[in-house]
A protein has these predicted regions:
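Short cationic/low-complexity microdomains
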Residues: 95, 138-158
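Solvent-exposed loop/turn segments connecting transmembrane beta-strands
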Residues: 46-58, 86-89, 138-141, 162-176
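Cleavable N-terminal export/targeting peptides
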Residues: 1-39
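Transmembrane beta-barrel architecture of outer-membrane proteins
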Residues: 42, 55-57, 94-100, 143-145, ...
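Short glycine/proline- and aromatic-enriched beta-strand/turn motifs that initiate or cap beta-hairpins
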Residues: 28-72
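Outer-membrane beta-barrel "beta-signal"
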Residues: 99-101, 170-181
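Gram-negative (and chloroplast) outer-membrane scaffold detector with strong preference
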Residues: 63-133, 152
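Transmembrane beta-strand segments that form the barrel wall of outer-membrane beta-barrel proteins
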Residues: 39-53, 72-80, 121-125, 157-168
Length: 181
């Protein structure tokens, strides 16, 4: 088994959870209560990097507010990585096209509108390209997954985002920027 060159996922999750708690406590004490992080009919653009056992995905996505507490969206991501399997080197590329829906807990939890805590489901079609002759696992197909995340807006438009997901090929974590239109 090839040893990962990336951050240990359990350490990363522990540190990012601490960061989210700190952001929550800071924003709760500084900002007044608001209506929610995204309004019905509002668009939000997201982009960033991910962390997984299958390379570092780069992603871009768009969310649309269908209700003050619910968004639907789409995302495109791509990752490349190299692997040694049975003594031979292989290159892989995975592209994921997905749709998602999230429930945003700001109103329910009565937290400031600049802090967005959400959870939801996603359905993605992944396209797995690999070197000729590769005998390991890897095929294209559909994947159903779940995500939970947090977003901190430091002004009316810009925010930072941290998300954890699982149960499909987009499993892992993501960190990036969000822009509300």
């Amino acid at each position: 088994m090839k040893k990962s060159r990336f951050i240990n996922p359990s350490d990363f999750r522990k540190h990012t959870l601490s960061l989210l708690i700190l952001l929550f406590l800071t924003s709760y004490s500084i900002y007044a209560q608001g209506d929610g992080p995204i309004s019905k009919g509002q668009l939000q653009l997201n982009a960033g990097l991910g962390f997984s056992g299958w390379g570092v995905p780069v992603y871009i996505g768009l969310d649309y507010g269908v209700h003050p507490d619910i968004t639907i969206g789409g995302e495109l991501s791509n990752r490349n990585y190299n692997e040694t399997f049975l003594g031979s080197g292989y290159s892989h590329s995975i592209t994921v096209i997905s749709v998602n829906s999230n429930y945003h807990f700001s109103k329910l939890l009565d937290i400031p509108s600049n802090l967005d805590i959400y959870a939801g489901l996603n359905l993605g079609f992944y396209i797995w390209n690999t070197s000729v002759g590769y005998q390991g696992s890897g095929s294209s197909g559909l994947g159903l997954g779940a995500q939970i995340g947090g977003r901190y807006y430091f002004n009316d438009n810009w925010g930072i985002n941290l998300e954890f997901g699982g149960a499909n090929t987009t499993s892992g974590s993501k960190i990036g920027a969000s822009y509300r239109f």
